[in-house]
């Protein structure tokens, strides 16, 4: 599933399982950033809510992290290119490559989710003001990942010789003043566990 500029959208009490098991290419000239191999990806959106859902890939072989980006699906839920004030709360993720991916966004709340047996649990990459709290992550190779990449201020690519020049501007994020920097992160009261 994908959503672009679908402001004030709520996905609630759904079950996502084994989507795109054939690994069809989904990112082309017509279907852009919001089309990718994941259970759901949203872009350029304000006030998106993903609540009370189940993302279940338990029929797949266990995700060990060695197959981090090549297994079926790169993420359970993926907020990218300017999700503003998204809420990803009270969901259950089973055997996902990455359960929750918060990328170049602002003000995302990731709370009260259960993540079981995944390659990565929660990944926050170059997003500002994210709040990660009250999540339970078990038997997951990379429970919480924080990343800062080279992109800033809505610019996907800068000129190699003059970094002041943006060669690939993402207009939505730039117009909203998003920094695309990992700043203002609050992370507390999460439980990370494993079994022997």
What are these model-predicted stretches?
Residues 1-196:
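Glycine- and acidic/polar-rich repeat regions and solenoidal domains
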């Amino acid at each position: 599933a994908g959503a672009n500029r679908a402001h004030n959208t709520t996905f609630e009490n759904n079950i996502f399982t084994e989507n795109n098991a054939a690994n069809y290419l989904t990112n082309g000239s017509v279907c852009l950033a919001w089309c990718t191999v994941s259970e759901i990806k949203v872009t350029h959106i304000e006030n998106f809510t993903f609540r009370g859902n189940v993302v279940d890939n338990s029929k797949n072989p266990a995700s060990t992290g060695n197959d981090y980006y090549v297994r079926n699906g790169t993420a359970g839920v993926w907020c990218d290119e300017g999700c503003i004030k998204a809420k990803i709360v009270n969901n259950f993720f089973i055997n996902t490559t990455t359960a929750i991916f918060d990328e170049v966004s602002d003000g995302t709340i990731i709370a009260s989710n259960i993540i079981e047996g995944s390659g990565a649990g929660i990944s926050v990459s170059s997003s500002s003001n994210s709040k990660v709290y009250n999540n339970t992550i078990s038997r997951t190779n990379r429970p919480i990942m924080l990343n800062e990449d080279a992109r800033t201020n809505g610019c996907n690519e800068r000129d190699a010789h003059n970094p002041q020049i943006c060669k690939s501007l993402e207009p939505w994020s730039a117009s909203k003043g998003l920094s695309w920097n990992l700043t203002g992160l609050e992370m507390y009261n999460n439980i990370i566990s494993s079994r022997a």
